[in-house]
């Protein structure tokens, strides 16, 4: 595995990614970070965002991450995510519906708890939608 990293993205439901990659860029809670083979070991919390990686052929691929943790070792990155979806698996129609529901909940302003949940739902929907739309524009997976 010279020059490559094993990337594993796992949720409570399934293994989303388990493959050898060249690089990983993740949405850390303290800022985005990149990993190459031989990286110093560390743990990081992840925020909602896009995890990008370059596969063995050099193709850039992306995964939606809804928070979690990343363990980085010299030749392996393990992401434990609350939820995750490959860009190619995101359903743009479902994203649009989730976006509309979140916007309606924000406009209703029923109570503070619902308002905060609606803000988080809106951020998730916007990130997923952005990723789904970028798939169409750039052909990436």
From Swiss-Prot:
It is a peripheral membrane protein. Keywords: ATP synthesis, Cell inner membrane, Cell membrane, CF(1), Hydrogen ion transport, Ion transport, Membrane, Transport. The keyword Membrane applies. GO terms for cellular component: plasma membrane; proton-transporting ATP synthase complex. GO terms for molecular function: ATP binding; proton-transporting ATP synthase activity, rotational mechanism. It is found in: Cell inner membrane. Belongs to the ATPase epsilon chain family. Produces ATP from ADP in the presence of a proton gradient across the membrane. PANTHER family: ATP SYNTHASE DELTA/EPSILON CHAIN, ATP SYNTHASE EPSILON CHAIN, CHLOROPLASTIC. F-type ATPases have 2 components, CF(1) - the catalytic core - and CF(0) - the membrane proton channel. CF(1) has five subunits: alpha(3), beta(3), gamma(1), delta(1), epsilon(1). CF(0) has three main subunits: a, b and c. This is ATP synthase epsilon chain. It comes from Desulfatibacillum aliphaticivorans.
């Amino acid at each position: 595995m010279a020059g490559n990293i094993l990337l594993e993205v796992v949720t409570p439901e399934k293994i989303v990614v388990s493959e050898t990659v060249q690089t990983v860029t993740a949405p850390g809670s303290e800022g985005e970070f990149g990993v190459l083979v031989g990286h110093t070991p560390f743990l990081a919390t992840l925020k909602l965002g896009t995890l990008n990686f370059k596969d063995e052929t050099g193709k850039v691929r992306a995964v939606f991450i809804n928070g979690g943790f990343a363990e980085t070792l010299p030749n392996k990155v393990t992401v434990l995510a609350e939820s995750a979806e490959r860009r190619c698996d995101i359903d743009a129609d479902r994203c649009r519906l989730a976006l509309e529901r979140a916007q309606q909940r924000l406009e209703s302003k029923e109570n503070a708890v619902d308002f905060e949940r609606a803000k988080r739902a809106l951020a998730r929907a916007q990130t997923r939608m952005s990723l789904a739309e970028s798939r169409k524009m750039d052909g990436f997976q």
